[in-house]
């Protein structure tokens, strides 16, 4: 089954001080099927990694290698989030528009959302969107 990962879900694969176990499970799920992401995902991940470089959390060479590895995975970019739905989710669940975009994608495609963001997880639960479970690549709607 496809998954909608946000950046927090896979950062652990690049940054030593993030959750590597969860990230490895998400990346394995993507490799097995596919990830559906908004176009902003690629800008967001690059920004987070460059900021991490500035804070000496990652070397530039590691950023380049990580992005190259990600490019080999089956990512499907959904360029057309439904603006009205995204804005409604952001307002209703007090999310950033960025986070609401990931939630809207998971909701519309009826696939699990992979995130470590607690507010986004809570919003997904309230909206009835399944969350990615690393243990068996299953979803949890609790």
Regions from the PLM with identified roles:
Residues 39-42, 62-93:
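Acidic catalytic patch
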């Amino acid at each position: 089954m496809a998954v909608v990962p946000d950046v927090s879900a896979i950062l652990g694969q690049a940054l030593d001080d993030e959750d590597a176990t969860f990230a490895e499970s998400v990346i394995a799920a993507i490799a097995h099927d596919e990830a559906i992401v908004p176009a902003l995902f690629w800008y967001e991940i690059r920004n987070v990694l460059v900021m991490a470089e500035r804070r000496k959390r990652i070397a530039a060479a590691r950023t380049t290698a990580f992005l190259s590895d990600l490019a080999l995975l089956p990512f499907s970019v959904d360029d057309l989030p439904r603006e009205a739905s995204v804005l409604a989710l952001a307002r209703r669940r007090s999310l950033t528009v960025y986070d609401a975009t990931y939630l809207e994608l998971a909701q519309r495609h009826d696939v699990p959302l992979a995130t470590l963001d607690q507010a986004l997880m809570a919003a997904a639960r309230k909206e009835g969107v399944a969350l990615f479970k690393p243990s068996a690549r299953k979803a949890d709607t609790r």
